[in-house]
C-alpha cells in the first residue's frame, strides 16, 4: 500500500516568496498564482496532464523582471516533488513523452535518478512569450531538474512560440506522470538507492 505522496514546501528570499503544495497521486486540480499569467498557464497544464494536484502561490520582484519568480517557483516545485517521492520505492523512475500541439512538437525524457542534469534543445523566436522571457522557459526546466535531482532531456520544434512552450510543459507533465507511477515495491536501481 502506498502512503500519500504529498509535500508542501516554502521558499523565502529577498526576491521571492513561494509556496507549493503538491500531491503526486492527484486528479489534475490546480490553483496557481505566480503573478505571471503565462507561467500560471504552464503550471496548470503540468497539473492537468500530470494528474498532479498542485497549489502554487508566489510573490516575486516582478518590477525587476520574471527571472527570480520563474526560477524560485521551479526550485520549490522540484523540492516538493523530490520530498513527495520519498525513497522512490516502486516507481518506474524513467519515462518519456512526445506531445504535438499544432505546428509544435516537444519531446521530454527524464530519469528520477537523484543526479540532476539537463540537455535542452529549445529555440524560441520571440524574446517574450506572454509575460515570461523565452530564455526563462529553459531556465525553469534546468532549475526543476536541479532541485528535484532528476535528469531531463527536452527538445521542441515548431513555428509558434506559445505552442512550443505549451507542448514542452505538457510533455514534461506526461513524462513525470509516467515516471512516478508505482510498478513494484523495490527501489528502481541496481545500487539499491536513488
From Swiss-Prot:
Chief site of localization: cytoplasm
SUPFAM superfamilies: Ribosomal protein S5 domain 2-like
Protein keywords: Amino-acid biosynthesis, Cytoplasm, Histidine biosynthesis, Lyase
Pathway: Amino-acid biosynthesis; L-histidine biosynthesis; L-histidine from 5-phospho-alpha-D-ribose 1-diphosphate: step 6/9
Keyword Amino-acid biosynthesis (UniProt): yes
GO biological-process terms attached to the record: L-histidine biosynthetic process
Transmembrane segments: none
Pfam families named among the record's database cross-references: IGPD
One GO location term (cellular component): cytoplasm
Gene3D superfamilies, per the entry: Imidazole glycerol phosphate dehydratase, domain 1
Catalytic reaction(s) noted: D-erythro-1-(imidazol-4-yl)glycerol 3-phosphate = 3-(imidazol-4-yl)-2-oxopropyl phosphate + H2O
PANTHER family in the cross-refs: IMIDAZOLEGLYCEROL-PHOSPHATE DEHYDRATASE, IMIDAZOLEGLYCEROL-PHOSPHATE DEHYDRATASE HIS7
Similarity-based family: Belongs to the imidazoleglycerol-phosphate dehydratase family.
Protein name: Imidazoleglycerol-phosphate dehydratase
Organism of this sequence: Methanothermobacter thermautotrophicus (strain ATCC 29096 / DSM 1053 / JCM 10044 / NBRC 100330 / Delta H) (Methanobacterium thermoautotrophicum)
Upper classification of the organism: Archaea, Methanobacteriati, Methanobacteriota, Methanomada group, Methanobacteria
Amino acid at each position: 500500500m502506498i502512503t500519500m505522496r504529498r509535500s508542501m514546501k516554502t521558499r523565502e528570499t529577498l526576491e521571492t516568496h513561494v509556496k507549493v503544495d503538491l500531491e503526486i497521486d492527484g486528479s489534475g486540480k490546480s490553483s496557481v498564482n505566480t503573478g505571471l499569467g503565462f507561467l500560471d498557464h504552464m503550471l496548470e497544464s503540468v497539473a492537468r496532464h500530470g494528474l498532479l494536484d498542485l497549489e502554487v502561490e508566489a510573490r516575486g520582484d516582478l518590477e525587476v523582471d520574471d527571472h527570480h519568480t520563474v526560477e524560485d517557483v521551479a526550485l520549490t516545485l522540484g523540492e516538493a516533488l523530490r520530498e513527495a517521492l520519498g525513497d522512490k520505492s516502486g516507481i518506474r523512475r524513467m519515462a518519456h513523452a512526445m506531445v504535438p500541439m499544432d505546428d509544435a512538437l516537444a519531446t521530454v525524457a527524464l530519469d528520477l535518478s537523484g543526479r540532476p542534469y539537463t540537455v535542452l534543445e529549445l529555440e524560441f523566436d520571440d524574446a517574450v512569450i506572454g509575460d515570461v522571457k523565452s530564455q526563462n522557459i529553459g531556465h525553469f526546466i534546468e532549475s526543476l531538474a536541479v532541485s528535484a535531482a532528476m535528469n531531463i532531456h527536452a527538445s521542441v520544434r515548431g513555428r509558434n512560440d506559445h505552442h512550443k512552450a505549451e507542448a514542452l510543459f505538457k510533455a514534461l507533465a506526461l513524462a513525470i506522470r509516467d515516471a512516478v507511477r508505482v510498478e513494484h515495491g523495490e527501489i528502481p536501481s541496481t545500487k539499491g538507492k536513488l
